[in-house]
Amino acid sequence: MSLENKAGTCNLAGKFCTVAFLEKWRYRLGESSLRRQMKKNHRQVKAFNLRQAKEVGILFDATTLEKYEPVRSFIAFLQEQGIHTHVLGYINDKKIPDSYLLRRSFHFFSKNDLSWIFKPVSQHAINFYEKNFDILFCLDTENLFPLRYIATLSRAHFKVGRFFPDHQHFDFMINLKEDTSVAYLIEQIKVYLSNLRTSNESEINKPIPAEK
């Protein structure tokens, strides 16, 4: 390799490192902002099961159809139980697919709806986390910051989602191990929240192992 080619490679590597460092720094600023907002976030925690819930919020990663389809089936299941649903999906890209824009009663936001520190700033996102749902179902299995931001600030009475060791911001957490798919998370949510005894406080705010 010539000296000129080596210099070009080094320059590219340097630029990549700079971009990666800057993005990491921006995420840290976002985390710091979220921690400050958490201190101002007051809500009434109250457990609900699927027999009691009347209105729920569903928050999910809508980037791929693989994750979208199980969520759509879950929404249909909830509506069959007479539960009113509010749905917000995040597209981990700059453009929302045109087909998504035709979905009635669904709202979406994308990377273009994030601030410089990755904070969701779309009106749909703000309206969502300010609503007092009976239950918030966060169906994100990858701990994406924009979704975690909304879930953390949500005023829902009862927050349900996957257990993450470093971010325990749900009231009811399911510890996925081998199968970390959205479909499996939903399956476990249906099992546990159909049988949850809301008077038993020992079941709240601890990770629940997924059923075999």
For every predicted segment, state its role.
Residues 64-81:
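Histidine-anchored nucleotide/phosphate-binding helix
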Residues 14-34:
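Helix-enriched interaction subdomains in cytosolic or periplasmic regions
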